[in-house]
């Protein structure tokens, strides 16, 4: 049977509060739970109850925290560890030559693989106060060997002798060690009694797992975040620095420092070889790959001093860069600047070459230069001519000007700063427009704002294509209106030749008579009071004229009824034109 292995360490540190509330255990609660604890607690691997490897020989609540002393007794587990340690190159090297430790592959393998202790206890402190000491409601369930504990300061130290293990922790007093020895002897007597009772039958190994389960646990340990920084912090917190041990945590300083895990993450990497023997590692880590979960602090670049920099003007800086370009082409230069591309050579034009006729006249003057010169600046861009829409333009010409075609040889630049294009037939159409008769102008009446000014007619666009059928229909409608107005104009001219002698007498114009309204509805209302006056008037009009006077409208021949005009003659030419316009509107209706 293999020799047992003892493991010791703190399960709870009172000077280091945990980051999670469920892991907090006060000293008073620990004392109360220890009194209710019955029997030794099992010791397993990674809280796997099937991988029980021994038992907890002693639990002592000291000033620094809850200390545990366990014993690994499983032959199967120790045999697996022994075979695995023989395959490890790091373990096979043994302790350093200057160390007084004896080579022990099992202790070194356990110190590197299961470097922490973890206590399984009840989460609810209040509910655990009234719990009994049975296995179902016990306050402490078991202690596990793990890669790194969730509580800080729970570093595991392995050894073959219990006193040697307890001496690694400076926080334990002599009274604490004596109490642990008493618990260890009591648990040993209980274990001996149990082994004597089972001497008739083969002793059952508590380790029910296998090597595959241990391999799975080791793979899970690789994904623990910041495992090595936590182990370094735990080692300094516990104080396992001045005494040699098999702990595979990183190098710790010789003096005790204030522990802060947040500052520990930002510490620079410590040198692998130190001049102090107590600070050196038990085994060099040069041949071992760094685990995936570990983080290596990047090396900080030296800060630039004030006298390392020189201020230069921008022109001087660029001149230095330009002077260093020829040196960059030499062998071994650190940087090579790209060569400046030569300017493009212009094509040589031949006067007899038909393929070069599409080039403009400036291309005939270009010749390739003998030396590389900077490229010529681009020619100035001539703004496109702009011309307002000319109603005399054809559709094709107007579209060309609106799209902004460049001026051609048929254009000339006038003095007022605008472009003009000579079009065939333009002068002829301009003469026809200037010599147009009154028939091409819209009719205006006296009294209007634009009377006496020529107004252009609406031009019918009969020359458009079939796509402008809607515009042609609109032009035809304007032609009908124009013809009706021309007919009214001719009739009004005829009335002016006949009526002025009888209607525009000086005595009638001098008589202050109110001008009647020009609406047809008002004339109908005034027909009754004018009936008696119409009877006394001379009977020079026909019966048709008298009936029209009674109705208050103009007759079909545009001749004003004498009885109505005798009573209400027009006072001036404006009134006459208004009456004639009303008569024209009535005729159109």
UniProtKB/Swiss-Prot annotation:
Residues 264-273 have a biased composition (Basic and acidic residues). Its EC number is 3.4.21.97. Residues 514-543 have a biased composition (Low complexity). A motif (Nuclear localization signal 2) lies at residues 453-459. GO terms for biological process: nuclear capsid assembly; proteolysis; viral release from host cell. Keywords: Host cytoplasm, Host nucleus, Hydrolase, Phosphoprotein, Protease, Serine protease, Viral capsid assembly, Viral release from host cell. GO terms for cellular component: host cell cytoplasm; host cell nucleus. Residues 453-462 have a biased composition (Basic residues). This is Capsid scaffolding protein.
